[in-house]
Each structure stands twice: as C-alpha cells, then as structure tokens.
C-alpha cells in the first residue's frame, strides 16, 4: 500500500465514524424519530453526492452493463436492512450485532477467491481474529431474549446482505475496470431509496405510524435536516473512496476489517470525548483490542 492508499483509508475511517455521530444527534434531538425515514434521507443525499461527483461525465446509456450489479447491491441492502430489524424484534440484540459484524468475512474471502486479491499474511489474519474477539467482547452481555429459528434466519439475512453489499461494490469496480462507478452507485442508491420508501409506506401496525410521524416531524423541524444531509454526504464520500481503494488494488482483506476496527476505536473515543459516556470494562478491553487489530491489519 502507498501513502495515498493509507491517506484515503484514514479519511474513510473518519467519514464512516461521523455518520454514527450525526445519527446519534438526530435520534437524541428528534421528538419523533424514525430509523427508516432517517436512512431514506441519508441514502438520498448519498445519491446526490454521486450525482455531483459525476457531473459532466455521467453516461447512463450503457445501463445494461452495470444494472445487474445495481440490482444485486439493492437486493443485498434490502436483505440486510430487513434482516437486522427483524432480528432485533425476534431475539437478542447484542448477539445479533456480534454475528452481524461477521459479515466482513464475506468480502474478505470472496475477494481472494473471486477478485484475485492476495492471500492475507499471517499477521493480517491475526489482526482479523483479534478484531472478531474485540467485537465479541464489545457485545458481551446477558440477555433474556430467547434464540429462535426465525432469529437465526434473520441474522443470516443481515450477515449475507451486508457482506454482499461490500462484495458487489468491489466486483463492479474490478470486473468493469473502474468504469460506470458513479452511474452504478446512483442507480443502486435510487433502488435502495425505493426499498426504504416501500418499508416506510407499507409497514404494518405501530411502526407505520411511527414512521409517518417521524417523516412529518423531519420535514417540520428544519434543524434536523442538517444531520441527514451531512450523514448522506459522508456516506457518499465513504462509498466513493472505498471504490477508489478497490480500483487501486487494495485487497478487501485490508479495507473491510480496517474500517470495522477503526470504526470501533473512533466510535468509543467519540462516545467518551463528545458524549461523556461511561464505558464498561468490556468496552475498554474491546477498544484496546480494536486498536491492536488495526495495527496488525496494516502491517
């Protein structure tokens, strides 16, 4: 990896982390918050980011060349979104979050098998193991929720969906040699926005009312707009830079685990410094392990 690669990767760590900060600000300050409405807003502004970044060079005429990738990305995103929400409803949250984090293994393994990424060194494999341990420690808590077959299915949906989001993006860059990147993401995010809008509109029961109230509140409270706008732009930047790293032949075994480990470290740091949150011993240990894995992954 070159100095430029490391600079891009570091910028991705920060752009990925600030998305969580903006989300927290929104959910703390919104009178009637809706995760689906907020996600829809961020996706729309991520789409706008790609429109702006591609101004003057966008060409949708060869859409059939990248449409399969866009459909796969949107399907994976929708699968992950539905899986994560249903897993929360039907089983333990912490365990679901832990297994969900294992989705980073999918682009790592498929990157080696399908995309021709180099086999990670023993040190990087050790870094990946330490990262998984740190995620396990971070989510170590007793929960009363019972594990059911449905919960396992929904967790698997989340893992597979998240993993294939990352892999599909990398595959599009690799197999189409960096062409149609903006067009691919604009089409993908438009499809994702449609999926989220359908979830918000056609959801059943109390959730539908919460989403409707959340949407109206979001429109009325202009002070909340900035969080969705900034998070969406940061999301767009994150995706664009990840695609740049793939185009520069940085392997998935470095990109995804590094972003996960760095995100863990920066998120804990932000929680302590910005929100004065008290951290349990498990979180402190997880923070330290995340820092160690970050170093090992980039040796």
Annotate each PLM feature.
Residues 1-299:
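Polytopic alpha-helical membrane proteins, predominantly small-molecule transporters/carriers
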């Amino acid at each position: 990896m070159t100095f430029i690669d490391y600079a891009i990767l570091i910028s991705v760590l920060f752009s990925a982390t600030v998305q969580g900060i903006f989300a927290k600000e929104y959910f703390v300050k919104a009178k009637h918050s809706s995760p689906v409405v907020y996600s829809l807003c961020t996706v729309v502004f991520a789409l706008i980011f790609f429109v702006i970044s591609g101004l003057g060079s966008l060409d949708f005429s060869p859409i059939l060349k990248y449409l399969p990738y866009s459909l796969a990305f949107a399907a994976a995103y929708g699968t992950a979104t539905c899986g994560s929400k249903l897993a929360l409803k039907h089983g333990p949250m912490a365990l679901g979050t832990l297994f969900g984090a294992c989705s980073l293994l999918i682009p790592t393994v498929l990157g080696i098998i399908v995309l021709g990424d180099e086999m990670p060194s023993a040190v990087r494999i050790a870094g990946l193991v330490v990262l998984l341990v740190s995620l396990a420690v971070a989510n170590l808590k007793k929960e009363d929720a019972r594990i059911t077959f449905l919960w396992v299915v929904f967790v698997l949906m989340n893992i597979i969906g998240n993993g294939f989001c990352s892999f599909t993006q990398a595959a599009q860059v690799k197999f189409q040699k960096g062409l149609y990147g903006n067009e691919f993401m604009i089409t993908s995010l438009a499809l994702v926005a449609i999926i989220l809008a359908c979830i918000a509109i056609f959801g059943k029961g109390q959730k539908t009312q919460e989403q409707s109230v959340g949407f109206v509140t979001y429109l009325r409270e202009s002070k909340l707009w900035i969080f969705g706008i900034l998070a969406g732009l940061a999301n767009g930047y994150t995706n664009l830079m990840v695609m740049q790293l793939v185009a520069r032949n940085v392997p998935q075994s470095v990109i995804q685990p590094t972003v996960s480990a760095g995100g863990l470290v920066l998120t804990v740091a932000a929680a302590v410094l910005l929100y004065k949150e008290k951290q349990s011993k498990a979180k402190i240990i997880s923070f330290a392990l995340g820092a160690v894995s970050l170093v090992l992954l980039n040796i």
